UniProtKB/Swiss-Prot annotation:
Free-text remark on how the cofactor is bound: Binds 1 [4Fe-4S] cluster.
Protein's UniProt name: NADH dehydrogenase [ubiquinone] iron-sulfur protein 2, mitochondrial
Class of this enzyme: translocase
Name of a matching Pfam family: Complex1_49kDa
GO terms of biological process kind: cellular response to oxygen levels; gliogenesis; mitochondrial electron transport, NADH to ubiquinone; mitochondrial respiratory chain complex I assembly; neural precursor cell proliferation; neurogenesis
Iron-sulfur found in the keyword field: yes
Subunit and partners: Core subunit of respiratory chain NADH dehydrogenase (Complex I) which is composed of 45 different subunits. Component of the iron-sulfur (IP) fragment of the enzyme. Interacts with NDUFAF3. Interacts with NDUFAF7. Interacts with CERS2.
Length: 138
């Protein structure tokens, strides 16, 4: 729909698509099923190599922007050794409430309960059980 493409419209009226869209265009022109057992499916589409070359010349200018975006998102919930690595993250202001403050010394962390290990899920779990009393002795 048009609504999905809304974030990609810029002041040039979408004359120049974002780099990701361009990479997907290359992928669509040479699909993953291009290489098959016994050889390739067909010749490369006309103009594909020229388009990839032009894209790679222009994309190299945006490498720093992409690196900044990908390396600064590991500070909020670090994993592996990210909490031991020193790097800066831009800090802004919050427009939402802080929520519950855990007292010092108490432990709080985000968890997932995919199997319903939370108390609120007990009613739903019991409701999904189909108890047949004739088979209880088994």
């Amino acid at each position: 729909t048009y609504l999905q493409a809304l974030p990609y419209f810029d002041r040039l009226l979408n004359i120049q698509p974002p780099p990701r869209e361009k990479m997907f265009e290359f992928y669509e022109r040479m699909h993953a099923a291009y290489i098959r057992p016994g050889g390739v499916h067909q010749d490369l589409p006309l103009g594909l190599m020229d388009d990839i070359y032009e894209f790679s010349k222009n994309f190299s200018l945006r490498i720093d922007e992409v690196e900044e975006m990908l390396t600064n998102n590991r500070k909020t919930q670090p994993y592996d050794v990210y909490d031991q690595v020193e790097f800066d993250v831009p800090i802004g202001s919050r427009l939402y409430t802080e929520g519950y403050q855990v007292p010092p010394g108490a432990t709080y962390t985000a968890i997932e309960a995919p199997k319903g290990h939370m108390l609120a899920d007990v009613v739903a779990i019991i409701g999904t059980q189909d108890i047949v009393f004739g088979e209880i002795d088994r």
